[in-house]
């Protein structure tokens, strides 16, 4: 389980016993765990059910509570979201650059998604992407970006 906090304050020394990692390492771990981030996967247009966080953060069996009707509606319509957040893993050959955020995911020359976060990982990259719900996972897709570059990547839940 990935647990992390941001420490804000005047001290540059973290409390003893805390592991410190570079922002790039934290980003790689966040993406690998499939955790959406504000400004990348989450914004005012995001449908919460598309992010996959409902299974980890909402109880649909709890007794009566304020907002229960809204939660029940989210549960009954979650399969109706047009996209879902998926993890992407790809290999890069030689000196290849990481695909940028916004790169398209294509299956049989049809765009099925777009990368929202990308990080370097083990001779390749990991990413998160919103993909059309009709796409059967796991599968391989082509990651294509503006410079005419493309790489094959595995899409998984």
Where are these regions (language model features)?
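Conserved active-site beta-strand-loop modules that form the wall/rim of enzyme catalytic pockets
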Residues: 4-5, 28, 40, 61-63, ...
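Short, conserved active-site entrance elements at the starts or edges of catalytic domains
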Residues: 29-53
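Short, surface-exposed loop/turn motifs that are enriched in glycine and acidic residues
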Residues: 20-21, 57-61
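A short secondary-structure junction signal
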Residues: 5, 14-19, 41-44, 76, ...
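Proteins with a high burden of low-complexity, intrinsically disordered sequence enriched in S/T/G/P/A and R
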Residues: 1-4, 11, 41, 148-151, ...
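Glycine-rich, small/acidic residue-mixed loop/short-helix segments
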Residues: 46, 52-58, 66-68, 72-157
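Acidic, low-complexity central loop/insert segments
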Residues: 1-37
């Amino acid at each position: 389980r990935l647990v992390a906090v941001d420490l804000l304050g005047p001290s540059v020394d973290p409390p003893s016993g805390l592991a410190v990692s570079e922002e790039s390492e934290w980003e790689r771990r966040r993406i690998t765990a499939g955790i959406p981030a504000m400004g990348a996967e989450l914004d005012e247009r995001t449908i919460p059910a598309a992010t996959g966080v409902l299974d980890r953060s909402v109880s649909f069996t709890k007794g009566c509570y304020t907002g229960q009707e809204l939660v029940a509606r989210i549960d009954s319509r979650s399969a109706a979201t047009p996209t879902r957040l998926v993890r992407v893993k790809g290999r890069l050959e030689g000196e290849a650059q990481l695909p940028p955020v916004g790169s398209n995911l294509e299956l049989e020359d049809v765009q099925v998604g777009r990368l929202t976060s990308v990080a370097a990982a083990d001779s390749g990259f990991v990413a998160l992407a919103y993909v059309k719900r009709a796409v059967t996972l796991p599968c391989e897709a082509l990651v294509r970006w503006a410079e005419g570059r493309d790489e094959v990547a595995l899409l998984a839940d």
